């Protein structure tokens, strides 16, 4: 390459912004072209690149080729219009927002204390986003930490406060004494989760802290594998003929020999029925995970679309595979005691944007009508 010229063409006028001749004729060149002198304004323009090689063609002038590339200068952030009324959301629960954006975007959604939950574009061009209210956040903090955001194809970002009506919810708290027999039973059962830890107490604490945190991150990644449409309808169904043994966000403190050594939150419902009871899909959807996952043991996760998923763990067996489309009530597994569980039961959970929220809301047809489907229907009305 002997020479390169770059110009901006707009309204049939060419403004040359870069021109350089090279002493060495290399087959490939990388150049930086400053745009400061281009005098560009918002809108479309053509970037014209002319390159001349070092051959003797044209009486020694070389061969020249010109390429034009259609470009567009965009420095304006996208505009978001929220179509749903401000949601009412309780601590540990979930909410929905429908919105439109005035241009194509690379991503959009809701930020909850900096955690991004994507919205999904619908056939009518609007976006729907289910987003969580983390169980650890006070209402006054949560309502000031929810934002709606969008990034256009040029990288311009808009971000604004999303009005939410946040309410507190209380959760149960327990203090449990860890016995040596219990710690030994955990180590004997789950040593493979902490192979480098020899002490039974340290083994339990490693599983309760490190493995639990790693499992939560895995669930967030699983939560990204979702359909852009609602795959479910109606209230979710709980395990038939079951009794609740533990609730969502139960705060457990663990003592050993009278000293506090750890804590955890129980992020789901523990439901006990008969031994090896059939586990039905709580609603229609697509299976996105099956297999063993740390404290959850044998686990099935079903995607219901728009980042909403149901979770079934401690299973004795699994009767579906990833990719299966399941219907509400279809048997997907049997209850068991795999993972960090003692006694046959089902741990049932709900994920929104990869974050576990209380299943109670999704089991309630009135809550779904008032807070999800009714709001979406109203926002879509002409």
Question: Model regions: which residues?
Answer:
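Solvent-exposed, acidic/flexible segments
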Residues: 1, 42, 139, 211-212, ...
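Surface-exposed loop/turn and intrinsically disordered segments
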Residues: 1-126, 130-140, 146-172
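Polar/charged, compositionally biased leader and regulatory segments
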Residues: 24-28, 75, 156-256, 371-382
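Repeat-unit-sized solenoid/scaffold elements
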Residues: 27-29, 79-90, 127, 179-191, ...
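A general structural signal for short secondary-structure boundary/capping elements
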Residues: 95, 146-147, 194-196, 359-363, ...
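Short, charged, solvent-exposed linker or helix-capping segments at domain edges/interfaces
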Residues: 109-110, 173-177, 360-362
